[in-house]
Amino acid sequence: MKLSVGSYDNSTTVDNEAEILADFQQRSQQAYQCGENIMTFCYGESPRERIDWFISAARKMGTIIFIHGGYWQSCNKEDFAFITAGPLARGFDVMLVEYTLAPQTTLTEIHRQIGAALDAIGRQPGLCSPVYLSGHSAGGHLAACWQAHPVADAV
């Protein structure tokens, strides 16, 4: 592990970060290629305010909302589509939420965007309950911030 005291770039602390992300992207590309029931919708006006909804062909067990990580500064929802395979096979729909990254916007605005995304998800016809809010790294932080949102049954 590389140490970078005072750095706000977590990628500098992982020796093989590029290889890990490349693996995520390759497996995620397969998820999009194999996915028959994927719907994308916007929840705001900025180009990154969008959600990919992977709809399970199996019985409806609920919905998992996933907010991607990347230290609020990198990655996108498409990098994490590989996480959909297990939940889809078990009957869960999965929604991948995108948001504008820092420094193009502030953490306050990112937080607001996630709230707007959850509001938009709550208005979607066919939303299957219960709804589980989740995320990785920065996305986990954002999920925790919004755990009391009315659309979320659990985090």
Q: What do these predicted ranges mean?
A:
Residues 2-6:
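Short, contiguous pre-domain boundary segments
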Residues 7, 11-58:
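N-terminal cap/lid segment of alpha/beta-hydrolase-fold proteins
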Residues 57-87:
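Short, surface-exposed "cap/lid" segments of acyl-processing enzymes
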Residues 67-68, 97-100, 136:
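Active-site-proximal beta-strand/loop segments in catalytic clefts of secreted hydrolases
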Residues 75-84, 95-130:
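Catalytic nucleophile-loop/oxyanion-hole region of alpha/beta-hydrolase
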Residues 119-155:
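Primarily recognizes the serine-hydrolase "nucleophile elbow" in alpha/beta-hydrolase
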